[in-house]
From Swiss-Prot:
Gene for this chain: lsrK
Protein name in the entry: Autoinducer-2 kinase
Keywords: Cytoplasm, Kinase, Transferase
Its job: Catalyzes the phosphorylation of autoinducer-2 (AI-2) to phospho-AI-2, which subsequently inactivates the transcriptional regulator LsrR and leads to the transcription of the lsr operon. Phosphorylates the ring-open form of (S)-4,5-dihydroxypentane-2,3-dione (DPD), which is the precursor to all AI-2 signaling molecules, at the C5 position.
Record-stated family: Belongs to the FGGY kinase family.
InterPro entries from the UniProt entry: AI-2_kinase, ATPase_NBD, Carb_kinase_FGGY, FGGY_C, FGGY_Carb_Kinase, FGGY_N
């Protein structure tokens, strides 16, 4: 929970509901983009007994948590519900919700649900093994994270739910439905189902028909920032918002995060550093990667798409390193009243660029068509404790995250022709001053860090404001509200050093993948169906 103003505010405010993978938040902003207060709660996704890889989304409990967060945010802000002019919701992508024909939610899964591995393989075999390419050419998605394998799994193993289903939405749309009673999806989030056309920004029912699935469960498509409905009396009683408050279409977390960062024009590039790292490039028109390495998603800006690559578990790897090896540093940081990562960065800053040649093996570059990673490890360690220690390994991890990001951006530039002239760096990773400088050095372009680094909720609030006429347009408002903390200029000497390190790392990583292929080591993660 956070609160930035201890007096009783007055005026107009916007609320963003942000449903992440591990937590949910209700965040209140004023019209200048200042965060006033937030209520937050963690939530868990439930494995189903005897269903490997399953992660169901608990509709009943999670709605209660959302209501708790809304009431908490209003309380912390010392605001009456009448001060909230509009509300919008954003969420993790790929997670889906099914409703019966009366509009009641009956089943949902989180984005991390991986139960449909067999169904992914089954669908790949369609059309002489060409179905996945057809899906990608239309939607920019492969089958690994799409909705179709999950729907096919339900048809196989839960035909009762499959037969009852009348409508499908994303998790952000479920929140909007719980508030307003209305059902619709937006292109930015629904695009990750693999069933939405990148050009028309509407459903492609023929993809479901080709897969032998029902095409009568597709809800209306409304653009982000358009009015969906109003808070019902029932929802108002449950969550504390005022009945009649406008509910506006939100969207996918990454795309709304880009809106909150002002990344709204073709050619702009962002690296979003969280548990996963996303490298996102706005493309001037819909285009796909002929090698199927990169996913293409609809932006929340109408008519625009984004090339998106993903580095796996980057933030999680740093947390693992901190918790597994840095107990002393955690205690010292606590005594000094600083963040442990800040202390580790201070230590790592004294290590020369290149980290004495240590090569972390964690996430690979993105290969969307055949998506798997090598076993986690460190390569090229030294027995010299002056050169190989916690500070060296921490710096090596930061350098490696930047190298993987640079590789992913290079892949995007290769097929799209869009090469980054600067990078916006946001998310938790952007709090690291050393990490920001390393990213600039590795990519060779200036890196801009915003004041508001967790921008998804701000982007969602902008959508709410546009939907009720408080803001003129999504793109103009995103540009106007973003404020910059610092710009990092690349060190050209380090750039050459990191280019050589990148070449070496790519060769070593290829060999490490071979060990996974031989069954000698265990992949960090592999997509369903591989």
């Amino acid at each position: 929970m956070s609160q930035l103003d201890t007096t009783t505010p007055s005026g107009d405010y916007l609320m963003a509901l942000d449903a992440g993978t591990g937590s949910v938040r209700a965040v209140i902003f004023d019209l200048n983009g200042n965060q006033i207060a937030a209520g937050q709660a963690e939530w868990l996704h439930l494995p189903v007994p005897d269903v490997p890889g399953s992660m169901e989304f608990d509709l009943t409990t999670n709605w209660q948590l959302m209501c708790q967060c809304i009431r908490q945010a209003l309380h912390l802000a010392k605001l009456p519900a009448s001060a909230i002019r509009a509300v919008a919701a954003c969420s993790m992508r790929e997670g889906i919700v099914l409703y019966d024909r009366s509009g009641t939610p009956i089943w949902a899964c989180a984005n991390v649900d991986a139960r449909a591995s067999r169904e992914v393989s089954e669908l790949k075999e369609l059309h002489n093994n060409g179905f996945e390419l057809e899906v990608y050419q239309c939607s920019g998605q492969t089958l690994a994270l799409s909705a179709m394998p999950r729907l096919l799994w339900l048809a196989h193993y839960r035909p009762d739910i499959y037969r009852q289903a009348g409508t499908l939405t994303m998790i952000s749309d479920w929140l909007a439905n719980m508030l307003s009673g209305e059902l619709a999806v937006d292109p930015s989030n629904a695009g990750t189902t693999g069933m939405l056309d990148l050009v028309t920004r509407n459903w492609q029912p023929n993809l479901l028909e080709m897969a032998g699935l029902r095409a009568d469960i597709l809800s209306p498509v409304k653009e982000t920032g358009t009015l969906l409905g109003h808070v019902t009396a029932k929802a108002a009683q449950e969550c504390g918002l005022l009945a009649g408050t406008p509910v506006v279409m939100g969207g996918g977390d990454v795309q709304l995060g880009c809106l909150g960062l002002g990344v709204v024009h073709a050619g702009q590039t962002a690296v979003l550093g969280g548990t996963f790292w996303q490298q996102v490039v706005n493309l001037p028109q819909p285009i796909i990667d002929p090698n199927m390495n990169t996913r293409i998603n609809p932006h929340v800006i109408p008519g625009m798409v984004q090339a998106e690559s993903i580095s796996f578990f980057t933030g999680l790897t740093m947390r693992w390193f901190r918790d597994a090896f840095c107990a002393e540093e955690k205690l010292l940081a606590q005594r000094l009243g600083i963040d442990t990562y800040s202390l580790l960065e201070d230590m790592a800053a004294r290590v020369p660029a290149g980290a004495y040649g240590v090569m972390p093996i964690f996430s690979d570059v993105m290969r969307f068509k055949s998506w798997y990673h090598a076993a986690p490890s460190f390569i090229n360690l030294s027995l010299d404790p002056e050169k190989c220690n916690k500070a060296t390994l921490f710096r090596a991890l930061e350098e490696n995250a930047a190298i993987v990001s640079a590789c992913n951006l290079a892949q995007i530039a290769e097929f799209s022709g869009v090469k980054a002239s600067s990078v916006v760096f946001a998310g938790g990773g952007a709090k690291g001053k050393l990490w920001s400088q390393i990213l600039a050095d590795v990519t060779g372009v200036p890196v801009k860090v915003p004041v508001v680094k967790e921008a998804t909720a701000l982007g969602c609030a902008i959508a709410a404001g546009v939907g009720v006429g408080l803001y003129e347009a999504l793109d103009k408002t995103g540009e106007r509200l973003v404020r910059w903390e610092r710009e990092y200029i690349p060190n050209t000497e380090h750039k050459a050093l990191y280019q050589a390190a990148k070449t070496n790392w790519q060769a070593v990583y290829t060999d490490q993948l071979g060990l996974v292929d031989c069954g000698l080591t265990t992949s960090l993660w592999k997509a369903p169906g591989l």
